[in-house]
Structures are given as C-alpha cells and as structure tokens.
Amino acid sequence: MPPHRDGGQAQFIERPVADEGSPWLSKLLEWVQRHLTDDLTTGRLARQACVSKRTLARRFLETTGTSPADWVTGLRIALAKELLETTTLSVEEVADRCGFGSSFTLRHHFRKRLQTNPLAYRAGFRVPEVG
C-alpha cells in the first residue's frame, strides 16, 4: 500500500544521503545519481570508486547494510516513486528514466520492494475530484 497523507497531499520520499564520515560513498552516490540510466554493475561502481569489487561490496555492507546492487535499485525505486507521484509519464517512460531498462523490470522491483505495482502506487497519490 502506498504512503498516504490526509488531505490528498502526496508524501515524498527523500533520496538516501551517505554518511558524512564516508566521503568515498558520498562521491559515489553523487556519481550514481547522475548515471542512474546507465548499466551500473558492481564492477563499474568499483572502478568509479577506485577499489576492487570485493572491497566495494565489503565497504558497502559495512556502511549501508546492503549490497551495491540493492542500493542502486533502491535509488531507482525512489526516483520511480517520485515520477509516479508528480508526473503523468507512462510506466514505460518511468522505467526508462530510472534505468530499469523495461517496464517489466520496474514492475518486478516495485512489487518485490513495495508489494504493489506502479499504477496502483500512483493511484494512491491522485487527489479525489470534488462534486
């Protein structure tokens, strides 16, 4: 079920922010947000952070409690939620703008993480028409 606020006000989810004590992660987070539509493999993230894939995975787990792939998927889901809340883009267009590659992949991750589909999520943010 999508988040809800009384009065028809959409509830916006802030983007995750890296811990100030992790400058390497802050820099990587900024880079990833500029490249969300790219193919962001763990190898590519490791190269960007100038570390091995193993070091990246270990540091990620220590700092965020999750894997790099789950982290990127979370960023993409957050962007998809924002677009669904604030635009009339089709699910296909939202998937493309978020880097999912296909609407099928977006729906898969949406259902897995939010137990709903993109259209049902969007419907939770429509303001009911009066009269």
Cite the ranges covered by each PLM segment.
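Terminal helix-turn-helix DNA-binding modules in bacterial transcription factors
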Residues: 39-43, 51, 61-102, 123-131
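Basic, amphipathic alpha-helical hairpins
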Residues: 4-9, 20-41, 60-64, 81-90, ...
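Key DNA-contact positions within bacterial/archaeal DNA-binding proteins
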Residues: 54, 103-104, 119
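Short, solvent-exposed alpha-helical "recognition" segments
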Residues: 66-68, 115-118
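Generic C-terminus detector
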Residues: 107-108, 113, 120-129
